[in-house]
Amino acid sequence: MEYSFSDEQEQFRAVVQRFMRDKSPMTEVRRLMTTKDGFDRDLWMQSCDDLGLAGLHVPEAYGGSGFGFVEVGIVAEEMGRSLLCSPYLGSSILATSVILHAGSEEQKRDLLPDLIAGKTVACLAFAEASGHWNSDGVELTALQSGKDVLLNGKKKFVLDGCAAD
């Protein structure tokens, strides 16, 4: 089976590649690796504004572009090529996907716009200290407190957890 990208996807790749090349020189990557967040929030918001990176796979009904995971993969490939420091995988792909698939309509309307705009960084915490991946090993507890839910426990390997809002 042979696969090739459409002309539109190749044009998108070229735009993303140019942005990454211009905005992510190796000296900047090294500098950002020593910062608290590990990425430049202003540059992240610019990538969301100019290229719509954070909302690529989010349906248009929620403010996204409505593209698929092929376009997400194009961005990931170009980010890997340039080593752009960003919360793309943790916030824009993992967290938004969980919200899209498990969130209520109210949660989607409330949470997705700021994630898509790059104003908010989210993370997904699912790995248990035990290393088990099934529901039997979950040690986290949730307690309803009025309208809020209080979470208690520990998670490991939380991608972008240090920068999440």
Question: Where do the model's predicted regions map?
Answer:
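N-terminal glycine-rich flavin-associated loop
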Residues: P87-E106
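Amphipathic, small/basic residue-rich leader segments at the start of a protein or domain
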Residues: M1-L89, D110, D114
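Glycine-rich, Trp-frequent "lid" loop and neighboring beta-strands that shape
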Residues: S65, E106-D165
